[in-house]
């Protein structure tokens, strides 16, 4: 396959059957350019924000992310030539930190936790303070930016084109952007499809748990505005150890995933 633009390596990911007994499929979003479903949002956001005149070549981009969206934005900013500041947790994985830095981003580390041990509120406050104190800075705000959740229309459309019938879709949630965008397109074509949001124990999105969350990439410490756009039927809370166990199960099938996919 010949690629004219490197960002064309985002989207149109493989759909793999992972269970012989039932028709159970996994969308392999790790095959995207920077390795995750968040590549869709980073690309869509940057391209549309440029087209709409919201950001220019000299605009500094800032975001709160210790994971895949930070990596994806760092990559897109590298391609576009924008400076990028990524506000992260102190417990960010060494691999993620090195990738973000390798792609040219500046990293700011949060230090204050909320009552449940989460750093997300401090990360967001750091971003708010920065954009107040500096000019020509754009906060991509993955928790409520319409560019983020609308980016996942493409994911929903791909699933609808690849499958003749969809009965259930399970979507891991954090910013709830993937859930919102994909659910819109799936419900358009398959209105009877049950869409299930999958959260992790210790997250605050659906239940006010006082349990500390240890796994990154799924769940968060508040209810993102993106959730208001989601067309989901139910949610389920997954134990962290069960998520890890399912990662190992998928690994036995040759599919390497993180905890959000395991959940």
Sequence positions of predicted segments:
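PLP-dependent amino-acid enzyme catalytic core
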Residues: 1-263
């Amino acid at each position: 396959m010949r690629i004219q633009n490197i960002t064309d390596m985002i989207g149109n990911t493989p759909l793999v059957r992972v269970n012989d007994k039932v028709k159970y499929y996994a969308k392999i979003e790790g095959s995207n350019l920077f390795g995750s479903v968040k590549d869709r949002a980073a690309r869509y956001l940057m391209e549309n924000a440029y087209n709409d005149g919201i950001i220019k070549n000299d605009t500094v981009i800032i975001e709160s992310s210790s994971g895949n969206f930070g990596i994806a934005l760092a990559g897109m900013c590298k391609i576009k030539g924008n400076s990028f500041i990524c506000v992260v947790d102190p417990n960010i994985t060494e691999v993620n930190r090195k990738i973000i830095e390798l792609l040219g981003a500046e990293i700011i580390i949060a230090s204050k936790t909320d009552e449940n041990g989460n750093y997300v509120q401090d990360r967001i406050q750091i971003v708010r303070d920065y954009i107040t104190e500096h000019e020509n800075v754009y906060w991509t705000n993955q928790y409520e930016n319409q560019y983020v959740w609308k980016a996942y229309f493409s994911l929903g459309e791909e699933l609808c084109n690849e499958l003749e019938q969809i009965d259930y879709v399970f979507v891991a949630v954090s910013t709830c952007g993937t859930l919102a965008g994909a659910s819109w397109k799936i419900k358009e074509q398959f209105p009877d499809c049950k869409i299930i949001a999958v959260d992790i124990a210790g997250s605050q999105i659906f239940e006010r748990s006082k349990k500390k969350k240890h796994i990154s990439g799924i769940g968060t410490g508040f209810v993102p505005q993106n959730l208001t756009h989601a067309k989901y039927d139910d949610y389920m809370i997954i134990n962290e150890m069960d998520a890890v166990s399912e990662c190992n199960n998928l690994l036995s099938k040759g599919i390497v995933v993180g905890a959000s996919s395991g959940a």
